A protein has these predicted regions:
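Intrinsic disorder/low-complexity segments
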Residues: 1-51
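C-terminal cap of metal-dependent C-N hydrolases
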Residues: 62, 66, 71-76, 407, ...
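Divalent metal-coordination and catalytic microenvironments
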Residues: 62, 78, 83, 105, ...
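Histidine-rich, glycine-flanked metal-binding segment
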Residues: 64, 68-109
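His/Asp/Glu-enriched, well-ordered alpha-helical/loop segment
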Residues: 124, 131-137, 142-143, 277, ...
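Polyanionic/metal-chelating signatures
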Residues: 156, 161-302, 439, 474-479
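Glycine- and charge-enriched low-complexity intrinsically disordered segments
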Residues: 454-479
Length: 479
């Protein structure tokens, strides 16, 4: 028989203790299904989590949002089994023995995904020793891989998880070169294994910032980028091998005037071969066109344009090139000379032209505030009601913070929606997720329900009803 619980009562269950082991178990199963290898040390831990892993969850009666741009489905059902979405929509049968959660009057959606962030790389920006967003004095650039620096315990991860964010694209910051290194896609689960895909893309700065990093001008930045890709193309490495300098033949001679180290050149091999995306940050329309022109010499490049404040001016070219864009939702100020044509209608105009657009948190003061992305998406919906402005439909706006970012990094077959086979990242809301007053009631990542507790809720609870003379002397996250 199935058991029935409301979202509120589900939250009262002791989910935190199970999440760590259950999510490790499910991640191991997911990786095995994809041909991955399970570490022996992890396997010994996973033996304790078998009961939680076998659970099937049925969320019934809610307003279901698939996340693919379509309209919400009233009275829908979502089935999660073994960490994956099995079915979602109307008329879905509830499997025998499933834990049934009544979501009547609630909204049920895929977890939110940020198309660009730096979450997990720093707790406090001002503390340089613990800030891993950039490597200003490193001898390496393109070969840098941010995955080892991701810290799942930073407070921002739990805070954003409680707001319905389940995945994020995390990019490094360029410091002494146009190449910042290789970014990752992570989950915001409450365990020690946050990496969904490491080396998901190579991040490059062009435009004004790229010019500064390359020696003072855009001319230098483009010369450096093209030369780097040419050098990588000349390196002999077996096809299909990972980006590892050890794949280069030891006896291979490289020209004496090469600019890249063996490590950086090898890291760019997958980029030239089209096996790893090249994420390029540009804002100005002419800079976007120059980035697109790279495909003339390097036709296998899988470009992703980030920023694109003036993307609406070259939307036709972006669509023709079939290049996805990750943009700030509402940039409308000429903050620099490369953003003079900024407009809040940028995302809407690009989408209307057929460009695949996702929303990210690009401004330095918001790269860890992922929880505001649904507010930004809601504002894009509101723009459709303003004469002369171009926004997004509700379905398009939600897709821009769910399946859109996943598609941009080539992972929409794994995450970002409630289509069958996707990872079980599901959120129950008490109302429209694009409305400011709406709150999160429950979150699942990889099919495991997550704790919504975080540093902010602990502070709230501790000081909600203070008594005179009874205030603690200091706050400890372990209390």
């Amino acid at each position: 028989m199935s058991s029935t619980t409301s979202p509120k009562s589900v939250l009262a269950e002791p989910v935190e203790a199970l999440s760590f082991f259950a999510r490790l178990k499910k991640k191991a199963a997911l990786r095995q299904a994809q041909g991955g290898r399970l570490l022996l040390a992890a396997a010994s831990v996973l033996a304790f989590a078998t009961p939680a892993t076998a659970q099937t969850v049925a969320i019934t009666g809610g307003r279901v949002v698939i996340g693919d741009g379509g309209d919400p489905i009233d009275g829908g059902t979502v089935i999660i089994r073994d960490g994956r979405v099995v079915a979602a929509g109307a008329g879905v049968a509830v499997p025998a023995g499933a834990q049934v959660i009544d979501a009547t009057g609630k909204w049920v959606t895929p977890g939110l995904m940020s198309g660009f962030s730096r979450i997990g790389l720093a707790e406090v920006d001002a503390d340089g020793d613990s800030n891993d967003t950039s490597a200003s004095t490193s001898p390496f650039n393109a070969s840098l891989d941010i995955a080892p620096a991701i810290n799942p315990a930073v407070s921002a991860i739990a805070v954003n998880r409680a707001a319905g964010v389940t995945r994020a694209v995390v990019a490094p910051s360029a410091a002494n070169s146009i190449f910042a290194g290789q970014g990752a896609v992570i989950d915001l689960g409450g365990d020690a294994d946050a990496i969904t895909r490491r080396r998901a893309f190579q991040y490059v700065e062009l435009g004004e910032t790229g010019g500064v990093r390359a020696g003072g001008s855009r001319v230098s930045a483009h010369a450096l980028l093209r030369n780097a890709l040419r050098e990588a193309g000349q390196v002999r490495a077996p096809a299909g091998t990972p980006a590892d300098p050890r794949t280069i033949e030891p006896a291979q001679e490289r020209a004496g005037d090469v600019m890249l180290t063996r490590f950086d050149a090898t890291a760019l091999i997958p980029v030239v071969r089209g096996q790893q995306a090249l994420m390029v940050h540009v804002e100005r329309a002419s800079d976007i066109l120059q980035a697109l022109a790279l495909k003339e010499e390097f036709p296998r490049l899988k470009l992703i344009i980030v920023g694109a404040t003036e993307g609406w001016r070259v939307a036709a070219q972006l669509r023709a090139a079939n290049v996805p864009v990750i943009a700030n939702a509402l940039n409308d100020l000429p903050a620099s000379f490369e953003q003079l044509a900024a407009t809040q209608s940028n995302v809407g105009r690009m989408r209307a032209a057929g460009v695949q657009v996702a929303i990210g948190q690009l401004n330095e003061d918001e790269t860890r505030q992922l929880r505001v992305m649904n507010q930004a998406a809601g504002n894009l919906v509101a723009l459709t009601r303003i004469p002369g402005a171009t926004g997004l439909s509700w379905g398009q706006a939600f897709a821009a913070i769910s399946s859109g970012p996943a598609a941009a990094v080539g992972m929409d077959d794994e995450i970002g929606s409630l289509r069958p086979g996707r990872r079980g990242d599901v959120v129950i809301w008490d109302g429209d997720p694009l409305e400011l007053a709406t709150g999160v009631e429950a979150v699942w990542i990889d099919g495991v329900q997550q704790s919504l507790e975080n540093r902010q809720t602990r502070l709230r609870d501790r000081y909600r009803n203070p008594q005179e003379g009874a205030l603690p002397h200091a706050y400890s996250p372990r209390d």
